[in-house]
């Protein structure tokens, strides 16, 4: 089994919204508070384009856009770990849009969400 590296001091946390984003309250304010906490701990943040989107029905954007965002941010060297910024009830809708072949050959990273 491959184990990802832990989040380094002053590392970068990537945020994605493969399901519900943070476009409405109380999620918007809670996400802003989480960002303040992480930056206060010295971490940099990289927010995906769907984090504040509300273009879908119960999902931040289209399944295609959400799958592409998750693939891009997981495979990116610009962040050390990934966190889903919102809910995950409709994440199953994006699974066939995620490029698992590309993810499989990428350096592993922690993903929570």
Regions found by a protein language model. Give the residues of each.
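ATP/NTP phosphate-donor binding region
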Residues: 1-78
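Short linear functional motifs in flexible/disordered or boundary regions
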Residues: 25-27, 82, 94, 106
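Short, glycine/charged-enriched secondary-structure capping and boundary segments
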Residues: 28-30, 96-99
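Charge-rich, low-complexity amphipathic helices
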Residues: 37, 59-61, 92, 96, ...
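General beta-strand structural signal in soluble alpha/beta enzymes
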Residues: 45-49, 83-85, 111-113
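Short coil/turn segments at secondary-structure boundaries
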Residues: 57-61, 86, 111
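Long, hydrophobic/aromatic-enriched structural stretches that serve as scaffold segments
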Residues: 67-98
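Short, acidic/small-residue loops that bind anionic groups at enzyme active sites
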Residues: 98-113
């Amino acid at each position: 089994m491959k184990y990802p590296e832990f989040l380094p001091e002053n590392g970068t946390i990537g945020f994605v919204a493969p399901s519900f984003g943070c476009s409405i309250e109380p999620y918007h304010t809670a996400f802003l508070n989480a960002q303040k906490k992480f930056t206060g701990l010295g971490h940099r943040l990289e927010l995906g384009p769907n984090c504040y989107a509300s273009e879908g029905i119960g999902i931040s954007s289209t399944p295609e856009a959400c799958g592409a965002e998750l693939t891009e941010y997981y495979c990116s060297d610009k962040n050390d770990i990934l966190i889903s910024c919102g809910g995950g009830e409709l994440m199953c809708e994006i699974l066939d849009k995620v490029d698992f072949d590309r993810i499989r050959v990428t350096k592993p990273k922690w993903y929570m969400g």
